[in-house]
Amino acid sequence: MKQSANATAKRSRTVVVLAIAVVLILLGSILAQTFNTSFYNVKVSRISFETDSGTLSGLLYLPKNVDASTPHPAIVTTHGYLNSAEMQDETAIEMSRRGYVVLALDMYDHGHSRGNAENTGGFFNFWPTSLWDAAQYMYQQDYVAKDAQGNGQIAVSGHSMGGFSSEMALYLDETNYASTGYRII
């Protein structure tokens, strides 16, 4: 009888500890979401869009006061090799808190993005156009600011391999400028 009382008490303690752990996990998740959205001043959503080279996806950080009537400058940022958009969370949160529209991008064949092999090239050729394609997408959004001449107010940023993609995006933007007369980036 004494052994069964000890087993019951032990089981009760286990249930209490488990319940406390679940409550702490839920509170931690709510707190993390609160910080991730800058105390709900930034809407964070996963978006995806089609390009000639495949499907790009990323996390869009949209400050609360941004819409077509009040467009804001944008920043497209991307990760290094073997990473995904979530790697840029801290940077994206800080930039969006300061009023920038931020797209933290998954490059082709990373995270939720998929490239078409015939359009992105062969092995390891996913990075040259990822950021450029995303900048073109952001330029088309009515909540992204443009100057009086139609130039986009979009910055690009990347970590490691994403830095190479940023350089390539700037090169492609200059090539585009030569034929269109306006800059996207």
Regions found by a protein language model. Give the residues of each.
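Short beta-strand element of the alpha/beta-hydrolase
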Residues: S69-G80
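Conserved alpha/beta-hydrolase
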Residues: S96-R114
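N-terminal cap/lid segment of alpha/beta-hydrolase-fold proteins
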Residues: I30-T70
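Short glycine-enriched nucleophile-adjacent loop
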Residues: G163-N176
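A conserved short beta-strand
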Residues: N176-I185
